[in-house]
Amino acid sequence: QARDAGIDLRFSVTATDFSRFQITDLCSLFANALENAIHACEQIPSPKKRYITLKVYEKNNRICIHIANNYIQNPVFEDEIPVSHETRHGIGVKSMISVVEKYHGVYGFFTENGEFRFQASL
């Protein structure tokens, strides 16, 4: 889907031990995060300016996840969480938070200089 939208997608995954996680939880987390990033990038008129980066690494026996993408339409936040008022949207972010909290992790959503970032440590 990202390739079809002309999005420059870059991955760096150095973490190797995911054994303590249910695969469905990880799939849900990454699928929702990437779907949101793709949706934001698709709004950018020039495909050459669209990008998503994903980094997954281990630090202090935790899995750290950083996903960043550019955007054109400023995200709306309520209580430091991005929200969508479109029908059937916003459930993905709640699902992401649920997965992070299930593994007693911490997360954050940030914007800076036209870049949206999701960071989590599980």
What do the predicted segments below correspond to?
Residues 10-29:
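Conserved short strand/loop->alpha-helix "switch" segment adjacent to the catalytic nucleotide/phosphoryl-transfer site
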Residues 104-114:
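Glycine-rich ATP-binding loops of the HATPase_c
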